[in-house]
UniProtKB/Swiss-Prot annotation:
Keyword Hydrolase: yes
Protein's name according to its UniProt entry: Bifunctional protein FolD
InterPro entries registered for this protein in UniProt: Aminoacid_DH-like_N_sf, NAD(P)-bd_dom_sf, THF_DH/CycHdrlase, THF_DH/CycHdrlase_cat_dom, THF_DH/CycHdrlase_NAD-bd_dom
Superkingdom of source: Archaea
Binding site for NADP(+): 174-176
Recorded GO MF terms: methenyltetrahydrofolate cyclohydrolase activity; methylenetetrahydrofolate dehydrogenase (NADP+) activity
Keywords noted in UniProt: Amino-acid biosynthesis, Histidine biosynthesis, Hydrolase, Methionine biosynthesis, Multifunctional enzyme, NADP, One-carbon metabolism, Oxidoreductase, Purine biosynthesis
Subunit structure: Homodimer.
Cellular component GO terms, alphabetical: cytosol
Protein's GO biological process: L-histidine biosynthetic process; methionine biosynthetic process; purine nucleotide biosynthetic process; tetrahydrofolate interconversion
Cited function: Catalyzes the oxidation of 5,10-methylenetetrahydrofolate to 5,10-methenyltetrahydrofolate and then the hydrolysis of 5,10-methenyltetrahydrofolate to 10-formyltetrahydrofolate.
Amino acid sequence: MVTWIRGEELHARTKEWARSHVKRLEEVGITPKLAVLLLNDDPVELETQRRFVTLKARDVREIGGEVEIYELYSAPPERRTKEALRLIESLNRRDDVTGVIIQKPLPPFVDEKALFSALSPEKDVDALTPENKKRLLTDFDLDRDVLPCTPAGILELFKLYGIDVRGKDVVVVGKGELVGKPLAVMLMQLDATVTVLHALSKEREPYVKRADIVISAVGRPPELYKDNPWRLTGDMIKEGAVVVGVGGKVDPATKRWFFDVDEKSVAEKASYLTPNIGGVGLATRARVLKNLIRTTYQVAQRVLSPRLYEV
């Protein structure tokens, strides 16, 4: 029988932890404030990102923080990078803004490298600036470092459920900058044997079939994409595999979610499985809160005193 890897406990516990730190920070006049930039005007991406941002914003407000959402997706394509850079420079200078998320994926015409290079690493909640990416190449501290939210959330779920990745054959399907790439690097740092599959990989199924752990982070459900669609089904995995589903998109016409993993068939063979609703999404949201508290302390140490440490 499958064991469901649920995110509710991690999410609730992190919210309580974050509330306690918000109270401590408020005693010295600092309130966590998250700024989120939305730049992608693709209908599917925009609808999906709006859902995610709404949930993140609710979490931040529930712990006592503040949120500012900047909708830049209506700017003309030729001006969108420039307007985003101007806003990022302003947010970097504002001491009341303690964390920034540039919501990914970005449209192809936006200069992603320029945006993340411009963002202050001190306020980088998603850990995607060049300086913060380097942290993954050395030993990282899952509890204390600002790390990519979804990969760190997945590793926290593994820790909570006692899933050891050392020496395991792990397949990561998807090589995106937000999940696939950083997660693969983090898993290698934890001594897993990692294979990364993507749209150009030949014969993906044999790799998936022999994997001890399969992490699907594609986000191209067949219902919404005719070009390179992806869905993980039960016949593709071995008996007893651990399966983590990350990818999901919202149909802007019906408002329905569609996911990477066929939950019903995979549950018949997997030993552990994240539910499409209430699994990795909650773990990611928990990590957003944890990272925001970390970046807020970094801002507070610069503005007030380097002696203001977390406890």
